[in-house]
């Protein structure tokens, strides 16, 4: 019934198996990849005919994690998987980025890649297995894919690189780097690092590239057994259109791309395009060419003009040379009520970044396959349509916004203080208010400034820069601080963030079929120069975290109580802790190990809450005097609440320094009194006294009598 084919190799000390022919046989390509006991299914389906009216590759990649893969049932009312999680969105992008450049340019058939995690062994992260499985499924599917690609995760610890570190090993590594590419070149890099230098980062990329070659060979071996026949792809000859267009548009386009200001340049380019369309599609005449083909040739002409001008003259669209960074203006404290804020402007790219400090109540609970954990640092990136002078729909967070936010998160995360030293939940929001290239790196710079403005003690300020590439044959130019046009018309988006000491995040996306080690080395060196320059400009606004938190930020005090006292502080059904919060206005968080965090922007409220909690969690001391409240009056005495929730009995004989006939002659319910703890009886009941305490001053009368000097004896008579 099944015609199965499989290939198995040893990879990084664990078996990697690729199998096809048993599951999802109606898909164009389907591969089950098993690494350790992590199992992933990747499927590829492409439409039979091209999609009408599109001039781009209609590719969709969806990565999904099933709860059953980890032996779990989803939470929530419906008990099934819902909208994609952040991890699923990020891995979908991780798969998309290296495969997209390898499709034949003219492929316009709707293509969908679905990758499903079927089993997770809690050791091997499914993302690398998903990349490998997707590459294999595409290679078998018959779609015009110029792969296969391989991928690997690289760690770095004890001055050694680690291939595909397990989840436990990742806890101790200084680097989390994912690299993907073909047998000849690197296509994609994504990483977070603890301030590592350029040589270590480049070494990690090349280490990963070398060590995923066996995976590429395994996919080729599987394809030789099971690949489908290649699909036919129409080869379109646009040379006639190009020849006519050069005559009517080249000079005008060159003039347009000499305009430095983005909106003016776009208007000039738009005018040239209107002229071209009017020429090729005159009113009342049958057009010779398809509109999409003409538009595609126009875009190619734009790219050629920009690219060759840079290679031939060294001059870019806005007049800069390859290494110059645009003018930078940094401001902090721009929003009066925010805990920390910064406005970072670089040329025509601008980010307003705001930091908010919260408490344990604000931590984000992440429900992952590997288990639930709490996240105390959140970074959110927003890209509204007005930032590029356009109208658009405002709605849910887009994939791009999630991806850019995570890139900035990776850049900042390594320089944050440990949570036990700075016990706040920190949320950073970047509002991109203007964009003309590298808004994610503006977010990194603005986030660093906003965090320091809020008083978050970063290890060092962090900056980011986006690099571009123009590659024609053996000639290339690496561009620092790229514009939006240089990003769209160039061959590489290479983003590097870090401190003066090293790199904290590196992300690279290649739009061609890969780049060499030499180009990456040049780009990293040039990026360091740019990063140091940007850090210098940022230092004009702020060089380190402010000594004090913002005026409106909550203060957090941390202390410990005995674990057997946690129940008393919380109370039945949370009654006690709710009362503390309601009456003091402070926020209280108690952890299982007895760590208590009290937060409030009001110092008096914080002191009151801390005193209340400590009074409950600690034991009263015999001989000490306490303020109390009479809570119940009996014939034999009065019960007084004197130590948190603790009550004790003042026997009728201890009410006053005289004979008392009735308890109510001295006290009634609600009276505020001062009591001394005498001790505990045989049953553990608390014994209190009022008569040995001055009810006005709180003075210990018993101790006063003991300390008083003895009366001198009278002199004998006649002496």
Swiss-Prot record:
Function, as annotated: Involved in mRNA degradation. Catalyzes the phosphorolysis of single-stranded polyribonucleotides processively in the 3'- to 5'-direction.
Lineage: Bacteria, Pseudomonadati, Pseudomonadota, Alphaproteobacteria, Hyphomicrobiales
Record domain S1 motif: where: 623-691
Catalytic activity annotation: RNA(n+1) + phosphate = RNA(n) + a ribonucleoside 5'-diphosphate
Species assigned in the record: Bradyrhizobium sp. (strain ORS 278)
Organism domain of life: Bacteria
Gene designation: pnp
Name this polypeptide is given: Polyribonucleotide nucleotidyltransferase
Binding residues annotated for Mg(2+), in chain numbering: 487, 493
Region ranges (Disordered): 691-719
């Amino acid at each position: 019934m099944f015609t199965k084919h499989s290939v198995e190799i040893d990879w990084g000390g664990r078996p990697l198996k690729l199998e096809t022919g048993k599951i999802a046989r109606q898909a164009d390509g389907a591969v089950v990849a098993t690494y350790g006991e992590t199992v992933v299914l990747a499927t590829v389906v492409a439409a039979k005919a091209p999609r009408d009216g599109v001039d781009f590759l209609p590719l969709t990649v969806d990565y999904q994690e099933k709860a059953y893969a980890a032996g779990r049932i989803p939470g929530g009312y419906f008990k099934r998987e819902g909208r994609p999680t952040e991890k699923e969105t990020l891995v979908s992008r991780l798969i998309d980025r290296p495969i997209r450049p390898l499709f034949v340019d003219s492929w316009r058939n709707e293509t969908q890649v679905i990758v499903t995690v079927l089993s997770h062994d809690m050791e091997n992260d499914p993302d690398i297995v998903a990349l490998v499985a997707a590459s294999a499924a595409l290679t078998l599917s018959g779609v015009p894919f110029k792969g296969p690609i391989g991928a690997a995760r690289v760690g770095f610890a004890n001055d050694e690189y680690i291939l595909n570190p397990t989840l436990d090993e990742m806890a101790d590594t200084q680097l989390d780097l994912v690299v993907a590419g073909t047998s000849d070149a690197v296509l994609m890099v994504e990483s977070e690092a603890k301030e590592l230098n350029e040589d270590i980062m480049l070494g990690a990329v090349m280490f990963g590239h070398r060590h995923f070659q066996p995976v590429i060979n395994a996919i080729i071996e599987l394809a030789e057994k099971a690949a489908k026949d290649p699909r036919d792809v129409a080869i379109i000859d646009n040379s006639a259109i190009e020849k006519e267009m050069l005559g009517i548009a080249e000079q005008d386009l060159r003039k347009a791309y000499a305009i430095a200001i983005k909106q003016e340049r776009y208007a000039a380019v738009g005018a040239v395009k209107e002229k071209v369309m009017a020429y090729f599609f005159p009113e009342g005449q049958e057009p010779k060419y398809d509109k999409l083909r003409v538009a595609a040739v126009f875009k190619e002409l734009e790219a050629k003009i920009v690219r060759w001008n840079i290679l031939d003259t060294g001059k870019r669209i806005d007049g800069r040379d390859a290494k110059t960074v645009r003018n930078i203006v940094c401001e902090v404290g721009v929003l009066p009520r925010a805990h920390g804020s910064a406005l970072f402007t670089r040329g025509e790219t601008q980010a307003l970044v705001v930091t908010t400090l919260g408490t344990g109540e604000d931590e984000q609970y992440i429900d992952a396959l590997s288990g639930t954990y709490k996240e105390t640092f959140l970074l959110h990136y927003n890209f509204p349509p007005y930032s590029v002078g356009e109208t658009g729909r405002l709605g849910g967070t887009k994939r791009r916004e999630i991806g850019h936010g995570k890139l900035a998160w990776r850049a900042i995360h390594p320089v944050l203080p440990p949570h036990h030293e700075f016990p706040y939940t920190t949320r950073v929001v970047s509002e991109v208010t203007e964009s003309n290239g590298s808004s994610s790196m503006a977010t990194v710079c603005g986030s660093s400034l906003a965090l320091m403005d809020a008083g978050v003690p970063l290890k060092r300020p962090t900056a980011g820069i986006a690099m571009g590439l123009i590659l024609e044959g053996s000639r290339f130019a690496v561009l620092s601080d790229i514009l939006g046009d240089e990003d769209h018309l160039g061959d590489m988006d290479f983003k590097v963030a870090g401190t003066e000491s090293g790199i904290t995040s590196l992300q690279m996306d290649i739009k061609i079929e890969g780049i060499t080690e030499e180009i990456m080395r040049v780009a990293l060196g040039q990026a360091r120069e740019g990063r140091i320059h940007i850090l210098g400009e940022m230092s004009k606004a702020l060089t380190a975290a402010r000594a004090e938190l913002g005026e409106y930020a909550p203060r957090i005090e941390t202390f410990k109580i005995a674990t057997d006292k946690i129940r008393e502080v919380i109370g039945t059904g949370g009654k006690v802790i709710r009362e503390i919060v309601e009456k003091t206005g402070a926020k209280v968080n108690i952890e299982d190990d007895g760590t208590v965090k009290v937060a409030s922007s009001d110092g008096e409220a914080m002191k009151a809450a801390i005193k209340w909690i400590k009074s409950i969690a600690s034991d009263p001391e015999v001989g000490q005097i306490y303020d109390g409240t009479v809570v119940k009056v009996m014939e034999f005495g009065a019960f007084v609440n004197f130590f948190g929730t603790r009550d004790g009995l003042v026997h009728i004989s201890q009410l006053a320094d005289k004979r008392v006939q009735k308890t109510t002659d001295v006290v009634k319910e609600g009276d505020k009194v001062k009591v001394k703890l005498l001790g505990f009886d045989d049953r553990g009941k608390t014994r209190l006294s009022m008569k040995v305490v001055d009810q006005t001053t709180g003075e210990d009368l018993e101790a006063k009598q003991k300390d008083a000097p003895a009366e001198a004896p009278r002199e004998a008579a006649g002496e």
